[in-house]
A protein has these predicted regions:
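N-terminal secretory signal peptides that target proteins for export/translocation
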Residues: 1-10
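Primarily membrane-embedded glycan-assembly and transfer machineries that use lipid-linked glycans
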Residues: 13-18, 207
């Protein structure tokens, strides 16, 4: 390992650190790896779930998580009314494309820590006979100062995907340090234990840079501990993920490692889809990473909405010889894409 003498000049030390960073990036890029999917194509040119009516989903239906249960596709999605209040909608499908929605949300703000803007961005992972739902409570009510608005990662459990037991906020920001200083969001749980622990990737803020990816571990899926005192995956200048590196659907275990799809945003805040491979023996170690996005906004409804130029993948289902990817378009609609299993 290259060591930088403590007496070196600031410029020399900075140069050496840059060299170290380039060596690390080269090492990641050198690992041969092919993602477990082929080219992505849209299964439908139009949204498969869109806002409707005057109620809880009148302004937005997006950022879906999908699992298969008893032969049906079950979707939880972020719903938004015209006042900006957030809740989780519920829909089912026989074919993964045409969904029937419940007339009422399956989760609304009820717990004291959820009061404010509501609950959003579900991610589902089944372990044993229990479904674990990570979601975000977001305080965005009118009149709250911008520096007081925040989001925290929460957990709920269920056996039927309808009745949920809240487990509380599961990651508390460490405001005194340099990492995980403000918001926590987007918990993507690894489906099986590694080294005797469960692992989860999530979004948080570093003091010098917002929207980085962290990693935590747990023995019971309820109580979580930071694995590192720095991000496990950082943004990269000049690339599609220069501003945001946010976990997508829960990862899958492949022969090559822990495979995670993530959502990246560039300097213009265009959101597209990347991937990263972590070591199965050490979930904090990056083995390979996408150098360009595999999916990006193209359709008008992906470019124009509540937030322009966004495809945000949160749902992933293997359906025989194909993958189904469920995503939010421009923070307003739900879309679905597919790719062959490799």
């Amino acid at each position: 390992m290259l060591k930088v003498p403590y007496f070196a000049t600031r410029a020399a030390r900075a140069s050496a650190v840059t060299v170290l960073a380039l060596i690390a990036l080269a090492a990641v890029a050198a690992v041969p790896f092919t993602p477990p999917f082929g080219k992505w194509t849209r299964l439908s040119p139009d949204p498969i779930v869109s806002p409707r009516g005057e109620g809880f989903e009148s302004a937005g239906t997006f950022n879906p998580s999908v699992v298969k249960k008893d032969g049906k596709y079950v979707m939880l999605y972020r719903a938004q009314d015209r006042n900006g209040t957030l809740s989780l909608g519920y829909a089912t499908s026989d074919d993964g494309i045409r969904f029937n929605r419940r007339p009422e949300p399956v989760m609304v703000s009820e717990a004291p820590y959820e009061k404010g803007g509501g609950v959003e961005d579900p991610r589902l992972q089944k372990v044993g006979n229990t479904y674990y739902l990570t979601y975000t409570r977001y305080n965005n009510v009118d009149g709250v100062a911008a520096d007081k608005k925040d989001a925290q990662l929460c957990l709920a459990t269920s056996t039927d995907l309808i009745h949920w037991k809240r487990q509380g906020i599961i990651i508390i920001p460490g405001y005194g340090g340099k990492w995980n200083v403000k918001w926590t969001k987007s918990g993507a749980i690894v489906p099986e234990k590694i080294n005797g622990k469960y692992w989860m990737y999530y979004l948080a803020d570093a003091r010098e840079k917002d929207s980085q990816m962290g990693v935590v571990y747990s023995e019971d899926l309820l109580h979580w501990t930071e694995a590192l005192d720095h991000p496990v995956l950082s943004s990269r200048s000049g690339l599609f993920d220069s501003q945001v590196v946010e976990p997508g659907p829960p990862p899958v275990i492949t022969p090559g490692g822990i495979f995670l799809i993530y959502n990246g945003a560039d300097d213009k805040l265009v959101y597209s889809t990347g991937w990263v491979l972590f070591d199965k023996k050490d979930p904090t170690k990056v083995l390979a990473r996408a150098q360009e996005p595999v999916f990006a906004p193209e359709k008008e409804w992906e470019k124009v909405g509540q937030v322009p130029n966004v495809v945000f993948v949160e749902g992933l289902v293997r359906d025989g010889k194909r993958w189904l990817f469920y995503y939010g378009g421009a923070d307003k609609n739900v879309g679905v894409a597919t790719a062959p299993v490799l």
